[in-house]
Amino acid sequence: IGALTGFTPFKVEADDEPLCHFVESNADTPFFKKMLYTNEIDGIVSHFGQYRNGFLFVMLPPEGGTLELWLSEDKQVVNFKGNYNLRLLRFACWIAYGVATAPFKTVAIHTSTIVCQSKAILFLGESGTGKSTHTRLWRENIQGSVLLNDDSPILRIIDGEPWIYGSPWSGKTPCYKNESYPLAACVRLSQAPFNKI
């Protein structure tokens, strides 16, 4: 994990018991009991589902060599096995983090996020809609606007209030900030088939 860019700002001293342990495993990968989700991004086919004792995630890149991870039912142990290509490992860590932190009212969101007047604003939309372009325009035209994360910030509910955190997963823009802000707004972007102001 130390080879993955973006994680250094989030490193903490090991004073407390960690939320979960990442373990390189030599055990046999469990079998899916129930498939929950399958998708393909950039030729990488991913499967997510349940096995007998928890959750299983498998990535199959076009060049071969799968990366498999499975989380125990209590989500305290994340087992990794297979192809440790950094691109695969980064995404697998994102999945593991999401599953392990879900019980703590935490979720990663696909969005580009700015901070303006000490509050976070999320710009949501399908890939290619213009989320990053929109946050860039805010930074260029609205004084005090700064980028918090350009791909996958973390939303967490604390005492009934939504907070947004920077994360190690910021897409193509290297913006890894260990900061948090209250949520001011969520803006859903859609793209028209024409240009008009």
Question: Predicted regions: what is each one?
Answer:
Residues 1-122, 126-127, 137-146, 154-197:
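A noncatalytic interaction/capping subdomain that flanks phosphate/NTP-handling catalytic cores
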